[in-house]
Curated annotation (Swiss-Prot):
HAMAP family the record matches: EPSP_synth
Annotated active site: D313
Pathways involved: Metabolic intermediate biosynthesis; chorismate biosynthesis; chorismate from D-erythrose 4-phosphate and phosphoenolpyruvate: step 6/7
Keywords tagged on the record: Amino-acid biosynthesis, Aromatic amino acid biosynthesis, Cytoplasm, Transferase
GO cellular component, one term: cytoplasm
GO-annotated molecular function: 3-phosphoshikimate 1-carboxyvinyltransferase activity
Annotated organism of origin: Salmonella schwarzengrund (strain CVM19633)
Protein name per its UniProtKB record: 3-phosphoshikimate 1-carboxyvinyltransferase
Superkingdom classification of source: Bacteria
Zinc keyword on record: no
Residues noted as binding 3-phosphoshikimate in the record, renumbered to the chain: K22, S23, R27, S169, S170, Q171, S197, D313, N336, K340
Residues bound to phosphoenolpyruvate: K22, G96, R124, Q171, R344, R386, K411
Sequence similarity: Belongs to the EPSP synthase family.
Pfam families named among the record's database cross-references: EPSP_synthase
């Protein structure tokens, strides 16, 4: 297996313009494909997940052109539901941001489509979404294991009264919200359980509004969507920087700044993960906000005990930042780590112990006490981009760290290690 050893880093300083947000990129691509008119998307993320979405749209007859660096996409909308040219199988890798929204959107009208992906995708639950789509008339079969992909979709979704479980993934609700305006009937969606990652629903609602569709949101417990609507292209749309990707650089500034400035997100960003900067501030770093930047300056870091339900992806970065904080850090209400690219709670606990931390892994929390001195270890990444990027921070100590399968960052940030090296002064 390929590996990358990062030598100790004495200081991190400078600025980075972030690659486009994965969450925003794939939502914007799907809405542009469903919309009337031509949309020009700029600062699109070039990553595995986005390529899977683009390949799927292409197979569904959507025409688009990409710039040489794949960050600009000119896409001609279908002016309504996507139509398969015949029976079709779409391979979506391990891209939840493609699988969940497409599973819903392709239930409009009459299609015969199989959605499948990598072995890990077949372990990521989708039953709550399928249950909700069936309530709206969708005809869906599980081809292997009940409640998991691959799925066969045969259209039939018409809207109506729908319940969705919000406790596992907000992507299920996102998928229903984006599809419902194109259904022939009005749709009322009721959320059961505590809605996880609520800020990701705000991204969805924000983008739908950009494409001309507004819905009634009753305290995130009930959403009322008029049927028979159309999305309309906004013309040009700039994809903001990825706030989850910003977390590694901001944390590096907190631990070994200097000052690190990330551009492409700021106080006006729609992504909930910008709140990660508030957590660093609580730990002792100094944060400066602009409209399109966030800067972080080193401080003496102290442990925290916090509910992280609102920023589950960026919260992973706090788990490795905790190695540099005084005291025991507890991250709570993070059960949905277990249904991401890997079981992130298990993976994080396992790898933190390798570098010497004392770790308590609970059903939905993790408690981390740093060692006096970090140990050099080979870090398993579990084909999970965020594991690789989180554990790069170990090099901000006087100990090297070896990252196994470093190329897994291609899911959201293909040149992550080059960018980190560019801003780092070796010890």
């Amino acid at each position: 297996m390929e590996s990358l050893t990062l030598q100790p880093i004495a200081r991190v300083d400078g600025a980075i313009n972030l690659p486009g947000s994965k969450s925003v990129s794939n939502r914007a691509l799907l809405l542009a494909a469903l919309a009337c008119g031509k949309t020009v998307l700029t600062n699109l993320l070039d990553s595995d997940d986005v390529r899977h979405m683009l390949n799927a749209l292409s197979a569904l007859g959507i025409n688009y052109t990409l710039s040489a660096d794949r960050t600009r996409c000119d896409i001609t909308g279908n002016g309504g539901a996507l139509r398969a040219p015949g029976a079709l199988e779409l391979f979506l890798g391990n891209a939840g941001t493609a699988m969940r929204p497409l599973a819903a959107a392709l239930c409009l009208g009459q299609n015969e489509i199989v959605l499948t992906g990598e072995p890990r995708m077949k372990e990521r639950p989708i039953g709550h979404l399928v249950d909700s789509l069936r309530q709206g008339g969708a005809n869906i079969d599980y081809l292997e294991q009940e409640n998991y992909p691959p799925l066969r979709l045969r259209g039939g979704f018409t809207g109506g009264e729908i319940e969705v479980d919000g406790s596992v993934s907000s992507q299920f609700l996102t998928a229903l919200l984006m599809t419902a305006p194109l259904a022939p009937e009005d749709t009322t969606i009721r959320v059961k359980g505590e809605l996880v990652s609520k800020p990701y629903i705000d991204i969805t609602l924000n983008l739908m509004k950009t494409f001309g569709v507004e819905i009634a949101n009753h305290h995130y417990q009930q959403f009322v969507v008029k049927g028979g609507q159309q999305y309309h292209s906004p013309g040009r749309y700039l994809v903001e920087g990825d706030a989850s990707s910003a977390s590694y650089f901001l944390a590096a500034g907190a631990i070994k700044g200097g000052t690190v400035k990330v551009t492409g997100i700021g106080r006006k960003s729609m992504q909930g993960d910008i709140r990660f900067a508030d957590v660093l501030e609580k730990m002792g770093a100094t944060i400066t906000w602009g409209d399109d930047f966030i800067a972080c300056t080193r401080g003496e870091l102290h442990a925290i005990d916090m509910d992280m339900n609102h920023i589950p992806d960026a919260a992973m970065t706090i788990a490795t930042t905790a190695l540099f904080a005084k005291g025991t850090t507890t991250l709570r209400n993070i059960y949905n780590w277990r249904v991401k690219e890997t079981d992130r709670l298990f993976a994080m606990a396992t790898e933190l112990r390798k570098v010497g931390a004392e770790v308590e892994e609970g059903h939905d929390y993790i408690r981390i006490t740093p060692p006096a001195k970090l140990h050099h270890a080979d870090i398993g990444t579990y084909n999970d981009h965020r594991m690789a990027m989180c554990f790069s921070l170990v090099a901000l100590s006087d100990t090297p760290v070896t990252i196994l399968d470093p190329k897994c960052t291609a899911k959201t940030f293909p040149d992550y290690f080059e960018q980190l090296a560019r801003m780092s002064t070796p010890a």
